[in-house]
């Protein structure tokens, strides 16, 4: 019985108790909260539902709690239910009910923890979206890991997810990129406000090798060649780096297409037609303050050119027109102003502003021996995705970026993540999975199986701790999806690995060489198998491998 199963039982029991006393069962909350008590001696789980409801139905919390506890204790899946304090109910599960969690995991396998909780959502998840003017830096690398994991978590909760990369190929930064490449090809210094680094020289040389006449064309033709070829080569490298990192996208959306297709003009005309765009001083302004923004925004400048926000507005409209009812933008720390701006754009276009969510990620710092690592071999002044992967590997890189909330800045200690010790979180979790696989191999050699295991034998305290931790996994996925916080999965994996290691140290799983096979061995092997499956499921959600040997 998982906490969710227990919550359902409590809800059903509470309805029966209230109805039998002519009390209003509609006062019960939609979701019954079930938690593990801080003191394990108080029971397996606790609920405060009596405190929540008693006053609403005109009885004391102690009375309602007593009635509920008596009714719950009569259920075969409950070993005991006791009233505590002003109206808390402490619950102990029967051994057979605890074992049901293990059986459910073994039956559901890779599906354990998933649900249809968010099946009503069609999500457009846009992340990374780095300009094609250089390799992905650490901030973009954080989004590559977190965004990919969030997509997996949302899908596990039942949502339909489209992963999207907004390819910024329209604007002055692309011109500066082209001029930087051209200068490198000519052997000239990097232009002011240009891009430097070894990668600029490499791309410039590749363009000249592909087009030997590149520098012999007219200035306009030469700049356009370096612009188009440079962007294509840079973005090809970005896509390859992301793919090797385990992050792929369903859609690569070109910003330029918004202008070439007329999408910007259509969005502007729609805003004019519905009165949410007005003219002042020769420019056209969005009435964004009517929709929660701190100021109105210029959409079409007085010279007739579109302001940057015009593309943002057209992009919002395009996403909704494609059928997405939740559009998540994952942006850097310098984009706080975009939250109100994008929601205002959606509302002005006639869409639900809650259909736009903006997640803001904070900075990432790389440290070695307490000193910041600031230089990249190829990129010059910034550390890149490739640098991080080269230093600590893909699994450690992804895990180090995912396990902390994006709301806070992140320091990555390279020495810690390189180490093969329990201090390294990803090593600790992966070692737990490898140890569980080793147990399975040894069990096969000994002829121990768990097909007919009596799971009611799992009564040791450490067994109970492990079973309860396993039972929390579905709720962890649900919370991670609802709150858009995939770091909860990584932290859960660490908790599960730690709980397993303590179980392993306290409970002999397999018979020793001179021992006969016993029912407890089969039961503990089943528990180990369920733990391995759940740990593998958690690692899959953060995009980290689950090694069978280490």
UniProtKB/Swiss-Prot annotation:
Main location: cytoplasm
Main enzyme class: ligase
Protein name according to UniProt: Arginine--tRNA ligase
GO-annotated cellular components: cytoplasm
Quaternary structure note: Monomer.
GO-annotated molecular function: arginine-tRNA ligase activity; ATP binding
One GO biological process term: arginyl-tRNA aminoacylation
Enzyme Commission identifier(s): 6.1.1.19
Keyword Signal: no
Residues spanning the signal sequence: none
């Amino acid at each position: 019985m998982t906490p969710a199963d227990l919550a359902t039982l409590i809800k059903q029991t509470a309805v029966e108790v209230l109805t039998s006393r002519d009390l209003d069962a509609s006062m019960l909350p939609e979701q019954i909260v079930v938690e593990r008590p801080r003191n394990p001696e108080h029971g397996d789980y606790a609920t405060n539902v009596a405190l929540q409801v008693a006053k609403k139905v005109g009885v004391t919390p102690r009375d309602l709690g007593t009635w509920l506890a008596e009714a719950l204790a009569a259920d075969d899946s409950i070993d005991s239910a006791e009233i505590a304090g002003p109206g808390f109910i402490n619950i102990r599960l029967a051994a057979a009910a605890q074992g049901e969690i293990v059986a459910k995991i073994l039956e559901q396998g890779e599906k354990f923890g998933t649900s249809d909780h968010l099946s009503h959502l069609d999500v457009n998840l846009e992340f990374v979206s780095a300009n094609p003017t250089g390799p992905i830096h650490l901030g973009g690398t954080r989004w590559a890991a977190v965004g990919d994991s969030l997509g997996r978590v949302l899908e596990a909760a039942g949502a339909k997810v489209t992963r999207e990369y907004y390819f910024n190929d329209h604007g002055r930064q692309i011109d500066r990129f082209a001029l930087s490449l051209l200068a490198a090809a000519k052997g000239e210094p990097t232009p002011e406000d240009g891009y430097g680094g070894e990668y600029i020289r490499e791309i410039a040389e590749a363009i000249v090798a592909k087009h030997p006449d590149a520098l012999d064309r007219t200035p306009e033709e030469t700049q356009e060649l370096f612009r188009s070829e440079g962007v294509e080569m840079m973005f090809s490298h970005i896509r390859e780096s992301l793919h090797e990192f385990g992050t792929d996208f369903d859609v690569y959306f070109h910003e330029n297409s918004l202008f070439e297709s007329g999408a910007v003009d259509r969005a502007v005309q729609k805003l004019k037609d519905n009165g949410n765009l007005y003219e002042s001083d020769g420019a056209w302004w969005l009435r964004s303050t009517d929709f929660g923004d701190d100021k109105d925004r210029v959409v079409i400048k007085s010279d007739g050119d579109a302001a940057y926000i015009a593309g943002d507005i057209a992009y919002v409209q395009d996403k909704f027109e494609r059928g997405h009812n939740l559009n998540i933008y994952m942006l850097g720390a310098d984009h706080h102003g975009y939250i109100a701006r994008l929601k205002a754009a959606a509302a002005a276009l006639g869409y639900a502003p809650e259909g736009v969510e903006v997640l803001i990620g904070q900075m990432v710092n790389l440290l070695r021996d307490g000193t910041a690592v600031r230089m990249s071999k190829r990129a010059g002044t910034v550390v890149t995705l490739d640098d991080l992967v080269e230093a600590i590997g893909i699994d450690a890189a992804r895990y180090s970026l995912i396990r902390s909330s994006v709301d806070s800045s992140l320091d990555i200690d390279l020495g810690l993540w390189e180490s093969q010790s329990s201090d390294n979180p990803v090593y600790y979790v992966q070692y737990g999975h490898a140890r569980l696989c080793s147990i399975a191999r040894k069990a096969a050699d000994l002829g121990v199986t768990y097909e007919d295991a009596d799971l009611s034998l799992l009564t040791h305290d450490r067994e109970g701790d492990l079973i309860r931790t396993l039972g929390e996994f579905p709720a962890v996925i649900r919370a991670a999806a609802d709150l858009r916080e995939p770091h909860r999965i990584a932290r859960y994996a660490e908790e599960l690995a730690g709980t397993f290691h303590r179980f392993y140290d306290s409970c002999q799983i397999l018979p020793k060489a001179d021992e006969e096979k016993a029912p407890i061995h089969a039961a503990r092997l089943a528990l180990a198998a369920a733990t391995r499956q759940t740990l593998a499921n958690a690692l899959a959600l953060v995009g980290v491998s689950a090694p069978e040997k280490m």
